[in-house]
Amino acid sequence: MEKQKILDQIKGGLIVSCQALEHEPLYTKEGGIMPLMAKAAAQSGAVGIRANTVRDITQIKEVVALPVIGIIKKDYEGTPMYITVTMKEVDALVACGVDIVAVQGTGARRPDGSSAPEFIRAVKEKYPQQLVMADCATLEEGIACAEAGLILWVLRCVATHRRQKDATISIMHLSMNFPKNALQRSLQRDISITRNRQKKRWKREHSLW
C-alpha cells in the first residue's frame, strides 16, 4: 500500500491494538486469536491495526485489508527500552511487509548507546520508503523524533520498562490524572506530522483531533 494512501486511510480514525503477550489469556503458541480480534475491529469500523510479533502481523494481514502498525516487544539488558529496540526487530518487521514500523521514542538509550532520534535516522537511511512511527511520552521526545525525519508519532503513556510499575512522574501524571489533550496540542503547534493517541479515554471528545 502506498504511503500516502496509508496516511489518508488512518487519518482521523480509530486504530485498534490487537496484542497478547505470553503471560496473557488471549495468547496461544500457534496464534490465530489476534487475527480474529483484528477482523472484529475491521468489521466495527477500525481504520488500522497495531500488532506485536511477526507471526501475529502476518496472520492479521492475511485476514484484513487495513494498514498494520507493527512492533516487536523484547527486553534488553542495560536499557529500559522494549518496543522495537534494535535494527534486528526493524528488519524482521519490514521483511514481513508491515505498513508502519513503530519504535520506542522515549529518552532512554538503546543497547548500542543510540538515542531514539539517532535510531530513527538509521532506520530511515536503511529503509527510506518505510513509514516509521515513534511512541513518545513528552513534548520534547515528539519534537526530537519529528526532527529525525518522522511523519508519524503516537502519544502513549510509555513507562520506562514494561515490567516497571513506576514510570517518571510526568508520564504517570499523564497516564493517571487527566486526558492528554494539552500535550497533544503542544505537539501539534510545534511539529507538523500525523498524530495518533493510545489508551486512556474519559469522554468521546478526548479522542477527537
What are the roles of these predicted feature ranges?
Residues 11-16, 64-78, 124-137, 180-189:
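Short beta-strand/loop segments at the ligand-binding rim of alpha/beta enzyme cores
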Residues 78-96, 137-151, 184, 188, ...:
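Catalytic cores of alpha/beta
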Residues 2, 26-29, 50-69, 80-88, ...:
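Active-site-adjacent beta->alpha loops and helix N-cap segments on the catalytic face
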Residues 48-53, 57, 69-71, 99-104, ...:
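Short beta-strand segments at enzyme active-site cores
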Residues 36-50, 96-97:
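Catalytic domains of carbohydrate-active enzymes, especially glycoside hydrolases
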Residues 1-28, 61:
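N-terminal amphipathic alpha-helix/helix-capping segment at the start of soluble metabolic enzymes
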Residues 43, 63, 95, 125, ...:
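Residues at the C-terminal ends
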Residues 19-21, 43, 72-77, 96-110, ...:
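Glycine-rich phosphate-binding active-site loops on the catalytic face of alpha/beta enzymes
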